[in-house]
Swiss-Prot record:
Catalyzes the isomerization between 2-isopropylmalate and 3-isopropylmalate, via the formation of 2-isopropylmaleate. The keyword Transport does not apply. Pathway: Amino-acid biosynthesis; L-leucine biosynthesis; L-leucine from 3-methyl-2-oxobutanoate: step 2/4. This is 3-isopropylmalate dehydratase small subunit. InterPro entries: 3-IsopropMal_deHydase_ssu, Aconitase/3IPM_dehydase_swvl, AconitaseA/IPMdHydase_ssu_swvl, IPMI_Swivel, LeuD. The lineage of its organism: Bacteria, Pseudomonadati, Pseudomonadota, Betaproteobacteria, Neisseriales. It catalyses: (2R,3S)-3-isopropylmalate = (2S)-2-isopropylmalate. It comes from Neisseria lactamica. Belongs to the LeuD family. LeuD type 1 subfamily. It comes from the Bacteria. Disulfide bonds: none annotated. Heterodimer of LeuC and LeuD.
Length: 137
């Protein structure tokens, strides 16, 4: 899979989920930028893409290295929240524990909800017993 290196405010103007879908279809799994448009940033997580925010200086350094080295490859360790260059330089990035859990386990909002299926069914059964008029038919 591929990593997309971009400039600031990436995803501006793309308020629909089609933008992350297209990037995923093209083979990207992570996007690195100094900043992202808010809606795009959140849509990335909802669609299994990892948006990584680095400083402009860090992104500039990566662009220079990519331009100077054909076949340049970055390595991302989501569990450790690190990005490593071929020379061994490591950058850390922030991600909430919830979003990291979802990405590491391949969970979208439906998958996350289904992890609690037993609890949901138990609640429904308890409600059915205590308020049967809600369940006519």
């Amino acid at each position: 899979r591929q990593i997309l290196l971009t400039r600031k405010n990436f995803g501006c103007g793309s308020s629909r989920e089609h933008a992350p879908w297209a990037l995923d279809d093209y083979g990207f799994r992570a996007i690195i930028a100094p900043s992202f448009a808010d809606i795009f940033f959140n849509n990335c997580y909802k669609n299994g893409l990892l948006p990584i925010v680095l400083t402009e200086e860090q992104v500039d350094r990566l662009f220079k290295e990519v331009e100077a080295n054909e076949g340049y490859r970055l390595s991302i360790d989501l569990a450790e929240q690190t990005l490593t260059t071929p020379s061994g330089e490591t950058f850390t990035f922030d991600i909430t524990e919830h979003r990291k859990h979802c990405l590491l386990n391949g969970l979208d909002e439906i998958g996350l909800t289904l992890q609690h299926a037993d609890e949901i069914h138990a609640f429904e059964e308890k409600r059915r017993q205590s308020q049967p008029w809600l369940f006519n038919g």
